[in-house]
Amino acid sequence: SPLHAQTPPTVAAASDLKFAIEEVAARFERDTGQKLRLVFGSSGNFYSQILQGAPFHLYMSADEDFVFKLADAGKTVDRGRLYAVGRIGVIVPHGSPLKADGEFKDLAAALKDGRLQKFAIANPEHAPYGARAKEALQHAGLWDAIQPKLVLGENISQTAQFATSGSTQGGVIALSLAKAPSVAKLGAFALIPEGWHQPLKQRMVLIKGAPPAARAFYEYIATPAAQEIMVRYGFAMPKEQ
């Protein structure tokens, strides 16, 4: 079929999708024979690149505002579709003096008693999972006190590496990464209450000029086969599409 004759479309996906979308893409390839090129990074960096004309075909953001801004700039075919709602939590590596505590009570105590040297979050300037971590720390009244201890990851996947490598005492990462066996085995994880931050409304959109294979994958993400994988990685499925 003509689908298979094309070069694989490029998907720019937020780093929280690293494990989930690799699995969805593998199933899509098995079901359709169509290959995809997956590129992972922070939603904000991809937004800037697409604005400057980067050759991406499907943009899967962790924050819907970036999608709306691209749509307003005339870069997309429409305003896209909500595909998942993400969650954040605290991960502490084995051997850390911190406890995995989603309400930051132990983190607050550790700031006072000197147990905390370094704590990882994604850069809130361009990584939505970092922006939500900042909101949660603000909610807990710890944002100012924790400033000197923060180590910023370029995206949430690098943040997960920082938080589990032993170079920090822990960090705030995506539930979807904590659910991956390769990350889960590195430490203990606790969800942060969802009311402590703005919801991580994850929206995807086709970029103007996207080939049919990109649209096929866009539609595939809404199928039960794909959603079953997303749910396994801790994503909530949006009510409105």
Which residue ranges define each predicted feature?
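Exported/periplasmic ABC-transporter solute-binding proteins
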Residues: 5-54, 61-64, 68-76, 81-86, ...
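Bacterial N-terminal signal peptides
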Residues: 1-2
